[in-house]
Amino acid sequence: MTKIALGLGSNLGDRQNNLTNAITKLSKILHNITISSILNNKAMLLPESPKEWNIDFLNCVITAKSDMDPKQLLQEIKKIEQEMGRITKEKWEPRVIDIDILLYNDLYIDTENLTIPHAGLLHRDFAIGLLAEIWSDWKYPVPGEHYQKTAFDLAKRLQK
């Protein structure tokens, strides 16, 4: 089994209940789930996004063990999002649930359909902070400026 981290967010409907329902569904396909704190965050939007999309998100991070490969995991996550009523027409529009694969242990993948670690991870301070709460010793696997820095070390930069 492989340790993974997922980022969850909701900014439509009963956001807290949406996160709880998603975690319940994920618990049927994952093992040993640990849940971070839940934070309220501003929506990330493009400058030309409609103003009505500017709805705060509730976000959390979970870690778990998975016996699926990354592609299978992504397929299962997309099924859960659809079951919960997520309809994606445009990027960054409001959503009932958003589940992202942040990490798949120390794996580095960059394909058209899947990038692990998540492409936006280092640009989402809330995700790094929540990750550090529950998997502080995870090491960034991508060569470059942050290579082999732990989630704890990456989160420390937020305090400066």
Feature annotation, model-predicted:
Residues 1-30, 35-43:
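N-terminal beta1-alpha1 ligand-phosphate binding loop
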Residues 8-10, 66, 132:
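Short, structured patches in soluble enzyme cores that scaffold and shape functional sites
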Residues 26, 44-58, 68-75, 79-160:
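Flexible, gly/pro- and Lys/Arg-enriched active-site loops
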